[in-house]
Amino acid sequence: AWDPLPTGDGQKLSLRVQSNGRAYRSYSFSFTEPWLGGKKRNSLTFGINSSKYSNAFDPFTGQIDRDRSDTNYLKTTGFSVSLGKQLKWPDDFFSLVYTLNVTNYKLLNYPIFDQNFRTGTSNNVSFKIGLQRSSVFNPIFPTSGSNIMASVQLTPPYSLFNKNISSSDNKYKNPEYHKWRFNAEWFVPIGKAMGADKSRQLVLKMAAKYGFMGRYNKKLDYSPFERFQVGDAGLTNNFGLLGYDIVAHRGYPVYQSSDPTV
């Protein structure tokens, strides 16, 4: 029988377009091959993306200003390549992922971190290694198992080769940092599963998260990109454009906490 839709071997193709007019637009494309090389579970993912966030709102008129959208904006263009490998040791639940990411930021009258960095370009080039062990049953609605992940993300130490980078006009042209993350989640079923298919299960989730961001040169400030954001639910802000990792803190505004030392 003729089948016009090939099933393939689990490849994933994604195309996403978002826009709300002059203020924001985003395009992204990615492709994942989960069986690179044929028999082994080695995944290869390639992705490209482009976005523009304009400060087009005029507070005096309460309207979107076309001219402001062309003179106050943040543009990002990037691509990434990721290679994942399932490990056999210590057990089959372990996987190792390597990711190369390149993102170009272009700012025009758009302060994001430093008031002196309102206009210019920045090239964020980083390499990330992530080790994960996941034994979660039913990933969409987990009922048991655990998910533990540790990763480190590094940029080249540009200041090691250019001693004058700290005194240059654009200190963030090539941002440098090293970023560490550790996440752990446990899902513990409570009581007996109910329902005809035993899918109704009360589950206790326990989690711990740790993040650290460092710099190679103390004369340079921390990178305005790839930071950690503490507070808020992480759903309604534009920090995703800057590569921020969101540490949700429900009930508190962005960057605020009951303990000012957090």
Regions found by a protein language model. Name each.
Residues 1-141, 146-148, 247, 255-260:
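Gram-negative/organellar outer-membrane beta-barrel architecture
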Residues 1, 113-262:
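C-terminal outer-membrane beta-barrel translocator/porin domains of Gram-negative envelope proteins
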